Swiss-Prot record:
The entry's keywords: Signal
Name of protein: Uncharacterized protein YncJ
Organism of this sequence: Escherichia coli (strain K12)
Organism superkingdom: Bacteria
Signal peptide (UniProt feature, chain positions): 1-22
Gene that this polypeptide is encoded by: yncJ
Keyword match Signal: yes
Entries under InterPro entries matching the protein: Uncharacterised_YncJ (IPR020117)
Length: 76
């Protein structure tokens, strides 16, 4: 009897611990108004990520080009 009661109490605590922790600071939940809004947000994020990657690739190529033109420091 005691083990069944203890099991029920532990199960109840486990089920509701997520709701209790969600109220504490440090847990941030963003409510999405609808699926359309979420998909547009993700598409915008993907577009920004692609632009940033292209820009980084251009800067990387320019850096390597400049580096290839410099004479080696050890040569005399």
């Amino acid at each position: 009897m005691f083990t069944k009661a203890l099991s029920v109490v532990l199960l109840t605590c486990a089920l509701f611990s997520g709701q209790l922790m969600a109220g504490h600071k440090g847990h941030e939940f963003v409510w999405v108004k609808n699926v359309d809004h979420q998909l547009r947000h993700e598409a915008d994020s993907d577009e920004l990520r692609a632009v940033a990657e292209e820009s980084a690739e251009g800067l990387r190529e320019h850096f390597y080009w400049q580096k290839s033109r410099k004479p080696e420091a050890g040569q005399r």
